[in-house]
Amino acid sequence: MSDEIKQIAALIGHHQALEKRVTSLTEQFQAASSQLQQQSETLSRVIRELDSASGNMTDTVRKSVSSALTQVEKELKQAGLAQQKPATEALNQAADTAKAMIHEMRREMSRYTWKSAIYLVLTIFFVLASCVTAFTWFMNDGYSQIAEMQRMEAVWQKKAPLADISRCDGKPCVKVDTRTTYGDKENTWMIIKK
């Protein structure tokens, strides 16, 4: 048991040393805290004093600048009124000239608008007349070709019963008399192209 008692005694001694250390640290913390609070109060007081001083300085500067600006404004107005009359007259004259030019431009634009409309109508009329003329020519030419084809069809229908038509390898073919053309071939069959 004596070892256990020694261990307990050592633990109690260690615990007491820790308590003393914690107490010492707590006292140091309280001292530092009170010192920090005093410095904070001092800093707050200095800030208030600086703020008051800067506020007074700002007001003084503001008043000085305001009075200087007022004086400059009065002087500029007096000088500007004397110089403003010729400039106003020149500006009014320029405005009158601009109005006259705008009126002239509008009149010219309306004239060009009418000319453009007339040219546009004439162009459309010319294009339509050209289209009608071309269409009429194509129709007449087409009808003449159709009439020629119908005439040829009538001729072929008259000659078709005289032709000997058959099938050659599954394709339509016609027997051709080659005596007058070739002289030496007889019974020749020609395939009809589609």
From Swiss-Prot:
Highest taxon of the lineage: Bacteria
Keywords: Plasmid
Primary role: This protein is probably required for relaxation complex formation.
Protein's name in the database: 22 kDa relaxation protein
